[in-house]
């Protein structure tokens, strides 16, 4: 990962151990933050031609859901989902110089409950387990667990503007030592506006802030960002997405502050009623006030996603 050389040279051994642990932590947090910029997974068995769809917020990615739907039929609030994906990266360690390429595997399973309290208020509850494994740099391997809950409010008179609030408990486990290396409680608040262009494509944009509530560590940070996206249904089985986000990562310790940008293009193809194949290509640039903490990376990926609603 990045060389955190802006820290005091006189760090104790425990501080150096924390720095080493921060390497997979930053990768994990970046993946968590930008998950909405990867392929946008469907949570319904109908296409835009069959249902009225509202794009969700990046906070929904923390809860495993990517779309909120106004069902014309009886809703099915429970979802079981699983993902298997492979990615390549030209900068596995998020380094400023001396970058190293690698490939990594991501597997995720989640259980989601999404009750619709009324036409304006939708809830969501999630339990998710994720596994990250690298081909060359096994010291970057980690497991991540998320428990979350949230609400999305859709005012009837504000022209497709949605307000959302999320709580997440996030836990990262070191694969080599089989112990916990990072935990965090966070609250995310945001607003999003959707612009329907037709029944098969639309634009959306929004803003969100994530506030960390856990104990301060070298990796604890607050995140504030604006984002925009475009979604199109090319056919009843093929979808495509463009996404861009610029965010401020404000770290609790060391005076570190990063401007992080992510751009993604993605496509998804429906193989069966419940199985989807997807591909994505992401570009990330990080500009930090810390010494040797700037980096950029490219990451193409392909995967399969299974979604069962009941």
Where are these regions (language model features)?
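Residues that define the transmembrane beta-barrel architecture of outer-membrane proteins
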Residues: 101-107, 141-147, 181-187, 218-224, ...
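Transmembrane beta-strands of outer-membrane beta-barrel pores
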Residues: 84-92, 115, 129-133, 167-173, ...
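Outer-membrane beta-barrel channels and translocator barrels
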Residues: 73, 114-120, 154-158, 196-200, ...
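Outer-membrane beta-barrel "beta-signal"
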Residues: 269-270, 274-276, 280, 296-310
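Surface-exposed strand-loop-strand hairpins of Gram-negative outer-membrane beta-barrel proteins
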Residues: 75, 85-112, 135-137
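Outer-membrane pore/translocation modules
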Residues: 127-221
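Transmembrane beta-strands of outer-membrane beta-barrel proteins
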Residues: 78-82, 107, 123-125, 161-165, ...
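N-terminal periplasmic/intermembrane-space "pro-region" immediately following the signal or transit peptide
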Residues: 19-79
């Amino acid at each position: 990962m990045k060389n955190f050389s802006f820290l005091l040279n006189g760090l104790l051994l425990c501080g150096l151990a924390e720095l080493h642990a921060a390497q997979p932590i930053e990768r994990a947090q970046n993946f968590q933050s930008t998950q909405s910029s990867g392929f946008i997974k469907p949570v319904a068995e109908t296409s835009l031609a069959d249902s009225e769809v509202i794009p969700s917020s990046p906070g929904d990615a923390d809860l495993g859901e990517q779309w909120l739907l106004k069902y014309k039929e009886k809703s099915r609030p429970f979802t079981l989902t699983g993902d298997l994906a492979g990615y390549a990266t030209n900068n596995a360690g998020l380094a400023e110089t001396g970058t190293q390429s690698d490939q990594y595997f991501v597997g995720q399973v989640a259980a989601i409950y999404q009750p619709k309290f009324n036409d304006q208020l939708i809830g969501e509850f999630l339990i998710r387990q994720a596994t990250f494994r690298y081909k060359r740099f096994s010291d970057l391997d980690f497991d991540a667990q998320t428990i979350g809950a949230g609400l999305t409010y859709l005012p009837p008179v504000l022209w497709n503007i949605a307000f959302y609030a999320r709580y997440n408990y996030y836990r990262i486990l070191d694969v080599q030592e089989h112990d916990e290396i990072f935990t965090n409680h966070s609250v995310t608040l945001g607003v999003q506006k959707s612009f329907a262009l037709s029944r098969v494509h639309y634009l959306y944009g929004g803003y969100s802030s994530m506030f960390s509530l856990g104990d301060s560590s070298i990796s604890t940070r607050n995140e504030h960002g604006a984002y925009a996206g475009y979604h199109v249904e090319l056919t009843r089985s093929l979808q495509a997405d463009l996404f861009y986000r610029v965010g401020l990562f404000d770290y609790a310790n060391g005076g570190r502050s990063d401007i992080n940008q992510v751009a993604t293009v993605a496509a998804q193809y429906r193989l069966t009623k419940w199985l989807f194949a997807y591909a994505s290509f992401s570009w990330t640039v990080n500009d930090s006030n810390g010494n040797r903490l700037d980096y950029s990376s490219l990451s193409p990926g392909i995967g399969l996603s299974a979604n069962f609603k009941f």
